[in-house]
From Swiss-Prot:
The lineage of its organism: Bacteria, Pseudomonadati, Pseudomonadota, Gammaproteobacteria, Pseudomonadales. This is Pseudopaline exporter CntI. Keywords: Cell inner membrane, Cell membrane, Membrane, Repeat, Transmembrane, Transmembrane helix, Transport. It comes from the Bacteria. Disruption phenotype: The deletion mutant is susceptible to treatment with AMS and shows decreased intracellular iron content after incubation with AMS. In vivo virulence of the mutant is attenuated. It is found in: Cell inner membrane.
Length: 284
């Protein structure tokens, strides 16, 4: 019965969202004493080792073709992690999660710019709704440190979209494990100069435990997500993943007493509704 459940794309997408939300909570806890770039380094280094072992077990070899695009995907993914973890450390989990979930719209824009894909007219109206929702969350006219951190969270969606467009170019010729390996290996290297001046040696078993858990849990979430896409359409998986916002809000409320304000809730609703409508537009 468990095996049958694990063949449900929707359930796997929910599990992936839940697992990534756990990772986000662990990142927020670790960021109390460790810099975001350092967390990215350990998360990526541990993940690189684990995915390499999976590649060995599955007999997947590193190819010599398409390396430049693999590196682009890796850099985009690395910058996504740095921005997202930095945002998680400074703003509520729900806010960071909502902003990161804006990536589908940037995927549409990048696909039009770099892949020559046509943007349906309806998407322009949905984009306006998303921009309005983002402004309600970022609050650019409040001139507070929160707004700066929220902009960094928004940048995480931009870099995530860049990574997604690169994956679309790579997935036809490269195994998923290889794409993930390059992402994690490059992220490990990118994190080194970013953490160089602020590196803090983890001093307690608790800090080491958090870093190890982040690496393992994030890879587990990646496996769930990959399996979800193999058992269900990309549209259904993408829509289902918005439940991750609820999970993140739950952890934020439970452990850090984070309660989103009215503007954030309203902006989040606009973004989620617009993104679901976008998925239906793409499906149509």
């Amino acid at each position: 019965m468990v095996l049958d459940l694990l063949k449900s794309g929707v359930l796997l997408a929910v599990l992936a969202s839940f697992t990534f939300s756990v990772m986000n909570a662990l990142v927020k806890e670790a960021s109390a004493t460790l810099p975001a770039a350092e967390i990215v380094f350990f998360r990526s280094a541990i993940g690189t080792l684990l995915i390499y072992l999976l590649m060995r077990q599955a007999g997947v070899a590193l190819s010599r073709q398409g390396v430049p695009m693999l590196l682009v995907r890796g850099v985009m993914g690395a910058l996504y992690l740095v921005c997202y973890f930095y945002a998680i450390a400074h703003i509520p989990l729900a806010d960071a999660s909502i902003l990161a979930h804006m990536s589908p719209f940037f995927v549409i824009l990048f696909s039009a710019l770099f892949l020559g894909e046509r943007i349906p007219r309806a998407v322009y109206w949905l984009l306006l709704v998303v921009v309005l929702g983002a402004l309600m969350i970022v609050k650019p006219f409040s001139y507070s440190s929160y707004s700066v951190y929220a902009v960094v969270g928004l940048l995480s969606a931009v870099f995530a979209a860049g990574a997604s467009v690169a994956i679309r170019q790579l997935s036809a010729r490269h195994h998923t494990y290889e794409i993930v390996f390059y992402f994690l290996a490059v992220a490990t290297l990118v994190a080194i100069p970013l953490m160089w001046n602020d590196f803090v040696v983890p001093a307690t078993l608790r800090e080491w435990g958090l870093l190890l858990a982040i690496g393992v849990v994030s890879l587990l979430g990646q496996v769930f997500l990959t399996r979800a896409f193999s058992h269900e359409s990309a549209t259904i998986v993408a829509v289902t993943r918005y439940i991750g916002i609820v999970f993140n809000a739950g952890w934020g409320w439970l452990f850090w007493s984070e309660v989103p304000d009215a503007l954030t809730i309203a902006g989040g609703v606009l973004i989620v509704v617009a993104c679901i409508a976008l998925s239906r537009t793409k499906k149509g």
